[in-house]
Amino acid sequence: MTTRLRARRARALFLWRSLLPGGVERTAITLVDHLQASGWSFFLGLLEPHGDFRAWTRHPRRLLSPRWGPRTERQEENLGFALRAIPRLGWYAVRAQALLNRVKPNLLFTHSGVDVLVAGALARRRGAVWIARVGSDAFSDISEKHPWGRPVFKRFLSAAYRRPDHIVAASEGLRRRLTEDLGVSSARVSVIPNPVDVARIQEEARRPPAEYATGDFVLGVGRLTSNKGFDLLIRAAARLFRNERPIRLIILGDGEEREPLRALARELGIEHLVTLPGYEPSPWRLMSRAVALVAPSRQEGFSNVIVEAMACGAPVVATDCHGPREIVNTGVNGTVVPVGDEEALARGLEELLREPERRARYREAALRRAQEFAVARVSDRYMSLFRDLATP
């Protein structure tokens, strides 16, 4: 039976691995900062002592970071990542227990990952309500890369997702994955999108752009991993080049695919059109000036980048993944194309490039759509869920 929260003076601990740059991490900081005004005490506890996003918080005293411990470099959460995390579970258990002892939370909110299993088990012993956030389709991602392990991984995830008292899915597609494929009761799953600090992003977007962001360009933003599909974007740009519609391409982010992407651009003869400057702490100043933002992911549970680009007025071309298809309305505020189809991606981008009226229409609609994910609106939905778990 779900443990009930006390409606007054409730204490909530958000437990995250680290604050390395990423959508999951920005979601945590944005929520914890905004929810401070709710009357509850919210804390963000980290299992690892690093992350550039620590500077993003407006409430540093509510950020609980260890001074030492293991450091995991940002990478895709695949089967190899999960296996490599096993030796760190002892540290995670010690760290999680220390945070629980310090905060004494009534509610524990975590993202999904191996650390969650440890933290959730500890929270059970303290009597805290455990809510897990699922923001990516780990089942599809790992099953496609390791089909031989699909049955075992399905059983593992099914068992893991039964343990939280409640689950928040970042999109309707993720909710269906949990309930239809992994056997999670629909009564235990809510759909709440990621929050976006629209006002703060629009303020940042007015800052001068980086020196390399001059002229017309198409923008990609994200971790440079296979899952993000930036190789498809480069191939699409090469098609446009061959069709005598060259466009400059800027891809922001770091990751193991950075050099392979450079090599691909050289191989396709468009190295002079592709810029890979690395991690950019303020991508919004480029989003506001881009001809279009392209999100070519192979898997995407939500997509903070798409909503942030919309908040900056950037027209969007995205692939038909769980999150993007629920954010982008083709022909209204952007274009959605099939996953993995570089020809369709090139075609969708070319249509935007040759139709300035369409770009202008998308910009206006995108600005309106972004407001639906504004942090005030989304955090109200989270607080409603938290209060539903509280004793009247």
Q: Which residues does each PLM region occupy?
A:
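Aromatic "clamp/platform" in nucleotide-sugar-dependent glycosyltransferases that forms part
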Residues: 279, 298
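Short hydrophobic beta-strand element within catalytic cores of glycosyltransferases
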Residues: 315-318
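Conserved acidic donor-binding segment of nucleotide-sugar-dependent glycosyltransferases
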Residues: 330-331, 335-342, 351-356, 371
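N-terminal strand-loop element at the rim of the active site
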Residues: 14-22, 28-30, 34-83, 188
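Short His-centered aromatic/hydrophobic patch
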Residues: 110-116, 134
